[in-house]
């Protein structure tokens, strides 16, 4: 089965072709980071308009890259939610217009399920079951994944997602957009232990997360720097140490909760997915823990940590392979800006 995947939930336009026999044939992505940078964040209307401009050139790119003709495609998968309503509507409209013109069925995909399954795109995918740490700008969850569509939420954030905390911390420190990569880069130049921040809910006894207090601690430190009248090189050094303290605290919590989930479920495989899964400090800490404690940890390729069409094409192929009745042949569709992943559980 050959599936075309279309991702447009936020500020990346992604298209890809995935074949159940041959794997990922082609994928193309356009990021809107440069466009949104001057506003300090995503502007939904601009995001929607840019998806319209980018989708068809990206389609031509993946078709040419893979040598695929439209007659070769069996189905079209698109991100149905969650995400920005306007952006979702663009992708859904393009998917269903192509499906109508080409006489193909469509299937709507949960954006987070795409992230959850994206580590299966590697050459040696992890077998089910596994624990998934889903960590992105909008979500932080620990899931027990038994099979496609068989998900159990073990823990989740009670307030800010980890990626959101990274972005807000970057803004407090005065870094550019997007904040997550910027604060991580700055943290690498900071001195470990120079600034020690709280580890929220580290000893809560459950698998839930909270990052709002960590963000507040960063704000408090910045006010201390201001009161001390730090400037110039001293201020830049203090900011680097603060960034290091923030990243160390966030990573400690994510690793500790992941280890607790593995212990609670007695599973030996951890899958990390979502944009924060590209963070080098997090990967290093989890890999070190895996080597010490004897479990396997799997990550998507760095290029597939961000939103992308490949994960949507994969999820569509896996769903249609198991449940052909999910194929939509009448081209009526809705989008779901708010959509709980747990509702997919079968």
Curated annotation (Swiss-Prot):
<feature type="binding site">
    <location>
        <position position="307"/>
    </location>
    <ligand>
        <name>Fe cation</name>
    </ligand>
</feature>
<feature type="binding site">
    <location>
        <position position="180"/>
    </location>
    <ligand>
        <name>substrate</name>
    </ligand>
</feature>
<dbReference type="Pfam" id="PF00814">
    <property type="entry name" value="TsaD"/>
</dbReference>
<feature type="binding site">
    <location>
        <begin position="134"/>
        <end position="138"/>
    </location>
    <ligand>
        <name>substrate</name>
    </ligand>
</feature>
<feature type="binding site">
    <location>
        <position position="279"/>
    </location>
    <ligand>
        <name>substrate</name>
    </ligand>
</feature>
<dbReference type="GO" id="GO:0002949">
    <property type="term" value="P:tRNA threonylcarbamoyladenosine modification"/>
</dbReference>
<keyword id="KW-0012">Acyltransferase</keyword>
<keyword id="KW-0963">Cytoplasm</keyword>
<comment type="similarity">
    <text>Belongs to the KAE1 / TsaD family.</text>
</comment>
<comment type="function">
    <text>Required for the formation of a threonylcarbamoyl group on adenosine at position 37 (t(6)A37) in tRNAs that read codons beginning with adenine. Is involved in the transfer of the threonylcarbamoyl moiety of threonylcarbamoyl-AMP (TC-AMP) to the N6 group of A37, together with TsaE and TsaB. TsaD likely plays a direct catalytic role in this reaction.</text>
</comment>
<dbReference type="GO" id="GO:0005737">
    <property type="term" value="C:cytoplasm"/>
</dbReference>
<dbReference type="InterPro" id="IPR017861">
    <property type="entry name" value="KAE1/TsaD"/>
</dbReference>
<dbReference type="InterPro" id="IPR043129">
    <property type="entry name" value="ATPase_NBD"/>
</dbReference>
<feature type="binding site">
    <location>
        <position position="167"/>
    </location>
    <ligand>
        <name>substrate</name>
    </ligand>
</feature>
<dbReference type="InterPro" id="IPR000905">
    <property type="entry name" value="Gcp-like_dom"/>
</dbReference>
<dbReference type="GO" id="GO:0005506">
    <property type="term" value="F:iron ion binding"/>
</dbReference>
<keyword id="KW-0819">tRNA processing</keyword>
<dbReference type="InterPro" id="IPR022450">
    <property type="entry name" value="TsaD"/>
</dbReference>
<feature type="binding site">
    <location>
        <position position="115"/>
    </location>
    <ligand>
        <name>Fe cation</name>
    </ligand>
</feature>
<keyword id="KW-0808">Transferase</keyword>
<feature type="binding site">
    <location>
        <position position="111"/>
    </location>
    <ligand>
        <name>Fe cation</name>
    </ligand>
</feature>
<keyword id="KW-0479">Metal-binding</keyword>
<keyword id="KW-0408">Iron</keyword>
<protein>
    <recommendedName>
        <fullName>tRNA N6-adenosine threonylcarbamoyltransferase</fullName>
        <ecNumber>2.3.1.234</ecNumber>
    </recommendedName>
</protein>
<dbReference type="GO" id="GO:0061711">
    <property type="term" value="F:N(6)-L-threonylcarbamoyladenine synthase activity"/>
</dbReference>
